[in-house]
Amino acid sequence: MKHVLSFGAGVQSTALLLMSCKGILPKLDCALFSDVGWEPQKVYDHLEWSRKEAAKHGIPVVVVRHTKGGIREDVVKNVTHKDGSRFAALPMFTLAPDGSIGMGRRQCTSEYKIVPINKYLRAEVLGLKPRQRAPKGVQILQWMGISFDESTRAKPSREKWKEHVFPFLDWGLDSPNGKTWRRYQIIAWLEENYPDIEVPRSACIGCPYHSNKEWREIAKNAEEWEDACSFDEAVRRDCRDASNAEHRSQQQFLHRSCKPLREVDLRSDEDKGQGTLWDNECEGMCGM
């Protein structure tokens, strides 16, 4: 049975990788990072650190990529050139002529993360040729870095040859409360055991799910901020890919306000002079 980590380079998956390095968890056969080609530089820096740290313990961190390229280029190419290739759907916010706000379909995770990883597992881990049947039964345990506060994200595998496992939920690891691991507890474990590293949130530069706080982090890097803003503008300026007039009439935006990203006021309440009665640092306990 092969043990493979779905490595997103975020807090939970980084902790699983390092717990395997320390022998707290079984030794992984490999960790797979699916590179969409549009992560912030701090994510790639952390990926490189993780690769070197895991290599000390004989665990390879493998980068897999979508065969057609990066998600940003694919989206822009479809939008501007109409070359007939398949549209890579980001869940952009949409503004209809009547002022109603919606959200587009989300297909990016499947196309640029799940599919490339499954192809790698079939070809490189199981040694299967394209369209060759996998052996019967579970061949791979695929670790998922999901903590108790986001347990609703824990989904079974659709492939019979692999099983999704959730060490923070199911494996009885000792945690500060003796039962389950929440995100803030995982952060505390990382700070105690690896105080010199900062684990970023792994998400595309132009991910529509960014909060204002996350957009402010992107804006600290002028090149990445310009990248996100120019993408936001290009999608509205050139998009003619919709299949009907109703969809073509809807403008698309990266920010939930349905305003151009350059024009959005990203300041926090404190920045605007509004006090707060509570510590707003998320402890990951609401389950959202």
Language-model features, listed with the residues they occupy:
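Nucleotide-activated chemistry modules centered on ATP-dependent adenylation/adenylyltransferase
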Residues: 1-288
